[in-house]
Amino acid sequence: MNVFWFIPTHGDSRYLGTSQGARAADYDYFRQIAVAADTLGYEGVLLPTGRSCEDAWVVASSLIPATQRLKFLVAIRPGIASPGLSARMAATFDRLSGGRLLINVVTGGDAAELEGDGLFVDHDTRYEITDEFLRIWRGLLTSAHHGESVEFIGRHLKSKGGKLLYPPVQSPHPPLWFGGSSPAAHEMAGEHIDTYLTWGEPPEAVAEKIADIRARAAQHGRTIRFGIRLHVIVRETEDEAWAAADKLISKLDDDTVARAQEAFAKMDSEGQRRMAALHGGKRGSRKELEIYPNLWAGVGLVRGGAGTALVGNAEQVAARMREYAELGIETFILSGYPHLEESYRFAELVFPLLPGRQRANANGPLSGPFGEIVGNHYAPKASQS
C-alpha cells in the first residue's frame, strides 16, 4: 500500500469557499509540505495542473533539492505541449531528481480552459491526440536509451527524426499515471498507462472501473496497477472527524455552491459528472453527503476534480483503505485541509495501522518522528494502537 500526499498549488485554507482561514500558496509553504511528506514517509506527492494552479513542472523542479526520497507526480498535457518538448522535460527532471519522476497524463475535461490554451477539439478527439502523443512520447524516451530516433505519422501528430540525447534514469521511461472515466479514457488507459487513478467513488463503482480497465489492458497483453485520489479527515474520535467535516464547509453559502456547480456542468468530463452526481449540487446533512460508510461528498460541492473524503477515526479510515485495497487499489493519493497540518495528522494516526508505512530512521529509534524523550532519559512507550 503506497500513500502519496498533495502539494496545494491552487491554494489552501481551513474552510472551503471563503478567504477566511486561507494561507498564502507560495514556495515556502509548498516546501514545508514537501519536506513534511518526505520526512513522514509518504511515497510521493501529486501536483495539480491547469490555470487554477501554479505550474506543476516549475514547482516540482524547485522541490527536488528540498527532498531526498519523495517522488513527484507531474502532469503532461497532450494537445497543449508537444510530445518532443514534454519528453525532454521528463528526461531532464528524471535525471536531476535521480529517478523520482512519475507522469500524470492529463487529457483535460474543461473545454473553456482548453480553448484558452489553444486546443479546439471535442472530447473523443482529445483522446485520439493523447493516444498519438503517448506513442511519440514513449518512443522518444525509450529510444533515448539506445541512441535511436522516432518516426511517427498520425492523424493529428507527426514526428520525423525525433530524438532525445539525454535518456531518463528510469527505463524505459518514467511510469505513466492517468485518470479518466469515459470509455475513450478507459481504452487509452488499457493500452498505454501503468497506473490508473480513479477519484473516490464508492467501492462498487471503483470495482466496476477496475474490472473494465483490466479487461481492456488484457486485450493489449498488458497488466495495470490502480490508485485512488481522496481527501481525508481523520481525528482521534469519529465525532471529532465529522465535526471537522462540517466545519470545512461551514462558510459555504448557496450562491457559492451554485456558481461552482454551474462551472462544473459546462465541462465535458465524465469523471466530473460522476463526482457531481454523488451530492446533487446541494449542501446537505451528514446523512445526505455520506454516500458510503465514512465516504463524504462535501468537498465536491465547490472543489473540482476529486470531491470525496474519507472521514472517521483512524481505525475507520484504515478499514476503508483496506476495503479499497482488496479491490486492487495499491496507491492512495490523499490530501486534507490545511495540507501541512493534515499531512502530520494522517501520518501520526493512520500510518501505524498500515503495515510498513513508518519509514525506518537511519539515526536510530530515539530520533524517530513520533514522540519526545521522557524525563531526559527514556524513549516514549510505543503506541498500542
From Swiss-Prot:
<dbReference type="GO" id="GO:0046306">
    <property type="term" value="P:alkanesulfonate catabolic process"/>
</dbReference>
<dbReference type="InterPro" id="IPR019911">
    <property type="entry name" value="Alkanesulphonate_mOase_FMN-dep"/>
</dbReference>
<dbReference type="InterPro" id="IPR036661">
    <property type="entry name" value="Luciferase-like_sf"/>
</dbReference>
<dbReference type="Pfam" id="PF00296">
    <property type="entry name" value="Bac_luciferase"/>
</dbReference>
<keyword id="KW-0560">Oxidoreductase</keyword>
<dbReference type="GO" id="GO:0008726">
    <property type="term" value="F:alkanesulfonate monooxygenase activity"/>
</dbReference>
<dbReference type="InterPro" id="IPR011251">
    <property type="entry name" value="Luciferase-like_dom"/>
</dbReference>
<keyword id="KW-0288">FMN</keyword>
<keyword id="KW-0285">Flavoprotein</keyword>
<dbReference type="InterPro" id="IPR050172">
    <property type="entry name" value="SsuD_RutA_monooxygenase"/>
</dbReference>
<comment type="similarity">
    <text>Belongs to the SsuD family.</text>
</comment>
<protein>
    <recommendedName>
        <fullName>Alkanesulfonate monooxygenase</fullName>
        <ecNumber>1.14.14.5</ecNumber>
    </recommendedName>
</protein>
<comment type="function">
    <text>Catalyzes the desulfonation of aliphatic sulfonates.</text>
</comment>
<keyword id="KW-0503">Monooxygenase</keyword>
